[in-house]
Amino acid sequence: DSVKSRGLGDVYKRQIISSDIGNNCAIGNAYPTFEEGRKYLAPGLFGPCGYGFPAICGAKIAQPDVPVVGFAGDGAFGISMNEMVSVGRDEWPPITMIIFRNYQWGAEKRNTTLWFDDNFVGTELDTDVTYAGIAQQCGVKGVQVDGMDALAEALDKAIEAQMKDKVTTFIEVLLNQELGEPFRRDAMKKPVSVAGIDPSDFRPQQPVS
């Protein structure tokens, strides 16, 4: 199957996909489709930043004959990017990893601008760093793309190389820096007291036997 239609559509029927936290991944989660169970690895609501990359590495170790694709934003990917050295070793199975590159912690930046009157701090990432370049220095393939068609083409080639030639590819997708709206507006509201509720109303916790 081709990924031309959405860039993150049906990669292969037997694909395993992992994602990370953040707005980029939340949007990307909408497009993959699956015909079997246990094909999608995601952090869910637990928020373990940096989950996507090591998760897809583990999936490939467990299922070496299955195509795997991980994706993460550049902030989350930076948490676990040290494992680029690991996957560069000859004995490691090949993977394909997509990194959405908007040079910022987008969700956190949007939240702080909402809370603090368009002010933000500590959310910008270094624009001189290229993850594709780091991948090449780690002995694997790194490519940069800047559009959906280019991503689709690069992803097709990367998965083919993964399955036929045992090649690991990191695809760095260059994005604009537009801040998206929070997925839950109610989460950004100021805390309020709930009328009529008192701590004494709650049942005391019991020790676990």
Residue locations for each model-derived region?
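Single conserved hydrophobic/aromatic residue that forms the stacking wall/gate
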Residues: 1-12
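Conserved hydrophobic/aromatic pocket- or pore-lining residues that grip, position, or stack substrates
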Residues: 6, 19, 58
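Conserved acidic residues
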Residues: 9, 15, 168
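Short glycine-rich phosphate-binding loop at a beta-alpha junction
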Residues: 14-20
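Short coil/turn segments at secondary-structure boundaries
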Residues: 20-21, 172
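Thiamine diphosphate
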Residues: 26-209
